[in-house]
Amino acid sequence: KAHSRIYRLTANEQKSHVLKPAAIPTNSPEIQNRLNPNKNHHFRNKVYNTLYTDTRGWTWAGTPDGLELFTSENDSAPRIFYRENGLSNNFIQGIIEDKYRDIWVTTSNGVTRIHINPENKNISFTRFNQLDGALDGEYIKDAVFSSSDGTLYLGGIDGFSIFHPDKDSIHPMLPDPPVFTA
């Protein structure tokens, strides 16, 4: 549980110790810097569902409202991508990289593959939905996995999708339907 107060331990007249609230707000920048001196300033006071650093050293930050991209430690501000840019949905659940250095993003409504052109660093988006073989609906926070052969497993509420980068295809894995017997 996060606390909104800082407490100070003081001795009273009976020489016993008393814990009293101090009149210092914990959300002040000075207190945050003292509590988290080595924390990157970009990530303070924000809500992130998932963070992923790819093989380029770029950090992708999934938020409830878009995908942020930090390409270096010196970035003054991240690039931010939304549904209008090509994401399936703005609520980012998971991020993973495939063996071809494409970034896969699971959201609250579908999957997006992000391709970065190695020559000019241009970014393009490909959405996958139920018609492409992806699960319909919401994916689960950080339910992404890459196996040793490069296969990606993307977990959703109703099962998971399997992506084989070599075949450029995505396959849903749904739970087995119930079997009724008499």
Sequence positions of predicted segments:
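Surface-exposed loop/turn elements that mediate protein-protein interactions on large endomembrane-trafficking
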Residues: 8, 13-17
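Short, ordered coil/turn segments that flank beta-strands lining enzyme active or ligand-binding pockets
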Residues: 12, 55, 73, 99, ...
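Residue-level "micro-hotspots" composed of small/polar
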Residues: 20-49, 65, 76-96, 100-182
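N-terminal/domain-start segments enriched in small and hydrophobic, helix-friendly residues
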Residues: 62
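Solenoidal tandem-repeat scaffolds enriched in leucines and small polar residues
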Residues: 1-6
